Amino acid sequence: MFSGIKGPNPSDLKGPELRILIVHARWNLQAIEPLVKGAVETMIEKHDVKLENIDIESVPGSWELPQGIRASIARNTYDAVIGIGVLIKGSTMHFEYISEAVVHGLMRVGLDSGVPVILGLLTVLNEEQALYRAGLNGGHNHGNDWGSAAVEMGLKALY
């Protein structure tokens, strides 16, 4: 479990009526899968979100997250969305361009639609950091935090 002052305080909010969408990239699935699982388990176990109210979709990569989320919320009603991707820095500037564009794109989709979009984007320097932040190798699973954030922001949007 996470310890230290960094990170959100635990939330005891309950959202059994919430409809949540998770859209994840298919790049770096070894880290993506536990992040998605952590978000889902946290929403169900800690916040009483019903499994049947959680939809999970995928897009090719993190670049496509904003577009995929925008298309999904245009077709269906959701109270909150989590966009999950993992970007691992390489030897070119590609990492910087993609990470900045995705962050801005996710914020824009949330502001334009009125549906809270949780930033579930890990931007890391290597695979080891990605796995650690996905709760593997003794690390804290950031998907847990994103699940709690989706419930809190979904409730804010609903009420």
UniProtKB/Swiss-Prot annotation:
Pathway: Cofactor biosynthesis; riboflavin biosynthesis; riboflavin from 2-hydroxy-3-oxobutyl phosphate and 5-amino-6-(D-ribitylamino)uracil: step 1/2. Transmembrane segments: none annotated. It is an enzyme of class 2 (transferase). Competitively inhibited by riboflavin (Ki of 17 uM). InterPro entries: LS (IPR034964), LS/RS (IPR002180), LS/RS_sf (IPR036467). The active site is at H94 (proton donor). (2S)-2-hydroxy-3-oxobutyl phosphate binds at S91, T92, R133. It catalyses: (2S)-2-hydroxy-3-oxobutyl phosphate + 5-amino-6-(D-ribitylamino)uracil = 6,7-dimethyl-8-(1-D-ribityl)lumazine + phosphate + 2 H2O + H(+). It holds the Pfam family DMRL_synthase. GO terms for biological process: riboflavin biosynthetic process. Coiled coil: none annotated. The keyword Transferase applies. Catalyzes the formation of 6,7-dimethyl-8-ribityllumazine by condensation of 5-amino-6-(D-ribitylamino)uracil with 3,4-dihydroxy-2-butanone 4-phosphate. This is the penultimate step in the biosynthesis of riboflavin. Also binds riboflavin with an unexpected high affinity. Belongs to the DMRL synthase family. Homopentamer. This is 6,7-dimethyl-8-ribityllumazine synthase. It comes from Schizosaccharomyces pombe (strain 972 / ATCC 24843). The lineage of its organism: Eukaryota, Fungi, Dikarya, Ascomycota, Taphrinomycotina.
